[in-house]
Amino acid sequence: MIGFVLACALLGAPMFAVFGALAMISYRAAGMDFSIVVGELTRLARMPMLQALPMFALAGYVLAGSRASERLLRLTRAAFGWMPGGLALVCVVLCTFLTAFTGASGVTIVALGGLLLPALLKDGYREKAALGLVTSGGNMGVLFAPSLPLILYAIIAQPISKEVTISALFRAGLFPGLLALAVLGGYGIWAGFHAQIPRRPFSVRELAAAARESMWEIPLPFVVLGAIYGGWLVASEAAVLTAAYVLVVEGFVYREMPLRKLTGIVRDTVVLVGGVLLILGMGMAITNYLIDQEVPQLILDWVGARIQNPLVFLMALNLFLLAVGCVMDIYTATVVIVPLLAPLATRYGIQPVHLGVIFLANLAIGYSTPPVGMNLFIAAMRLHTPLMKLATASLVLMGLMLGILVLITYWPALSLALVK
């Protein structure tokens, strides 16, 4: 029976249905009450942290569905376009920003790919570098608040470790995210030098015009992130503020959200959040079964007997998570892997919040890992480019992100400086 359920998963069955079926089969085999599955959904609905998820998702989808990306592209290009490789730097910054708000680098590729790739090619960037920047330049945006994967990780990990909160993860991701932004932006500048891109003259008039056009969107990251990092608002309050601000600005100030379009965006948000919550509820039911059967303890004993050195464990952990990121979306992976991984990492002395940053960085990289990373397929469809060409174009950025991952993994202070 379990084999049949797994076969359905491989054939494309919804993951919540697969998890639900696995939970019920496992509960029946163990003689456990089926009502526990329903109880998990009820407990999930009462979690205070969960309130932040739909509001941040709505804000991200509204931004992606409006012309905000065009205005912000004009603004960042006016501010940085005069630099050598300025447009490539703009590409990395803009993709990272949108990924942080949508929680999905694939959505960023869909929203910005058709805008950024022609601009990069027109400026004279080599096609390989341009494809790599558009496909992988925004992956590490999941480390910045108000990323949905950060919120989901906190929801899953907090019952295991009280140190893991949304606010703690938002702070922990800041310095690693800035490091990634600097390294990938540096690569973009180098790509501009290498292609001998002529520098554009800096225009105060163009910068002022671009700033005036996007004057209502410029305060968004400063207000929201300042409130979160400054401790003035909890995550759920910041989520409501973000959604309200974005809806007012895009709907009433810029008038780019007519009711018909907003209805579609709300529908997409509900589909995303509803899917995540169903997967989360069913996944937590499976986790309860695994805990009842002492599976985490068995894994602890098995791994502990084979790996004694924490540094070796971290290396094995990264290899495992990169493989997971290639074949599983970040939400499903968080629900399935974190409950088993968190107790194991604690045994090796890995700080729980630091583990969250390592986990999300790995899965973000896995999205563009050749040959099966999800972003490669999304970019192939959006940019009308062969998959293997995109995989080859992403190799340089993959190497840079792996170097960043090593620093994140073996330099805990990078993640924990603001948390402590």
Model-derived features with residue positions:
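Alpha-helical transmembrane segments of multi-pass membrane transport proteins
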Residues: M1-K420
